[in-house]
């Protein structure tokens, strides 16, 4: 009987701990990163053909090497954060309006990006964020000018975005 009560008290105590205490620490983030990026890639594969086949603006590239350079630069964290916000707040909500059959996959992608953004915020001492990005300003302006085609372009290039995130986080991991 006493062991049962102790087990119940331990369970209750664990349930009242803040959520961040139950999550992996920031020190293990770099070890968990490959799996998180793989999950993003697998989920994107479910919708990739839909968006890339509707991208008629093949002479325009939203996610250029200039963005990757910013990700790798001094203020890479800010660029990554802005791009995560761009996809979660602008691209994915509008993309969900284009296809009812892909909403689950897009919702899952959004949740994965939000989780990555939350981890970066929680582990802020590893990621210094402080400056606005010129490349992202250009991306957003081009995206808006393209209207609905911008959705297909941004979602069609989502794999490039994942690769850039990976480059940034692997670079941070080496430091």
Swiss-Prot record:
Q: What induces it?
A: By lipopolysaccharide (LPS) in white blood cells, liver and spleen 3 hours after treatment. Decreases to basal levels 8 hours after treatment. By primary infection with E.acervulina and E.tenella.
From which domain of life does this come?
Eukaryota
Q: How does it assemble?
A: Homodimer. Interacts with IL10RA and IL10RB.
Alphabetized GO MF terms = cytokine activity; protein dimerization activity
Give the intrachain disulfide bonds: 26-123, 77-129
Give its localization.
Secreted
Which Gene3D superfamilies does the UniProt entry name for this protein?
1.20.1250.10
- Name of this chain's protein: Interleukin-10
Keywords for this protein: Cytokine, Disulfide bond, Secreted, Signal
The text of the family note is:
Belongs to the IL-10 family.
Q: Tell me the leader sequence span.
A: 1-21
Mention any Pfam family matching this sequence.
Answer: IL10
Do the record's keywords include Protein biosynthesis? Answer: no
Where, by tissue, is this protein expressed? Expressed predominantly in bursa of Fabricius and cecal tonsils with low levels in thymus, liver and lung.
A GO BP term, please? negative regulation of nitric oxide biosynthetic process
Function noted in UniProt: Major immune regulatory cytokine that acts on many cells of the immune system where it has profound anti-inflammatory functions, limiting excessive tissue disruption caused by inflammation. Mechanistically, IL10 binds to its heterotetrameric receptor comprising IL10RA and IL10RB leading to JAK1 and STAT2-mediated phosphorylation of STAT3. In turn, STAT3 translocates to the nucleus where it drives expression of anti-inflammatory mediators.
Task: Say if the entry is tagged with keyword Protein biosynthesis.
Answer: no
Other facts noted in the record for this chain: Chickens susceptible to E.maxima infection show higher constitutive and post-infection levels in spleen and higher post-infection levels in small intestine than infection-resistant animals.
**Chief subcellular site?**
secreted
**The organism's lineage?**
Eukaryota, Metazoa, Chordata, Craniata, Vertebrata
> What gene codes for this chain?
IL10
Q: Name one GO cellular component term.
A: extracellular space
């Amino acid at each position: 009987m006493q062991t049962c009560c102790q087990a119940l008290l331990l369970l209750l105590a664990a349930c009242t701990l803040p959520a961040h205490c139950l999550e992996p620490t920031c020190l293990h983030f770099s070890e968990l990163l490959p799996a998180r990026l793989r999950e993003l890639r697998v989920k994107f594969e479910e919708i990739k053909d839909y968006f890339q086949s509707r991208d008629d603006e093949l002479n325009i590239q939203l996610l250029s090497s200039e963005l990757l350079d910013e990700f790798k630069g001094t203020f890479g964290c800010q660029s990554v954060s802005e791009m995560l916000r761009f996809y979660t707040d602008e691209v994915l909500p509008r993309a969900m309006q284009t296809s009812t059959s892909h909403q689950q996959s897009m919702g899952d992608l959004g949740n994965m990006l939000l989780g990555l953004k939350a981890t970066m915020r929680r582990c802020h001492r590893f990621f210094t964020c402080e400056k606005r990005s010129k490349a992202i300003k250009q991306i957003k302006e081009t995206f808006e000018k393209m209207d609905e085609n911008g959705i297909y372009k941004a979602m069609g290039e989502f794999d490039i975005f994942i690769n850039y995130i990976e480059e940034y986080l692997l670079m941070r991991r080496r430091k």
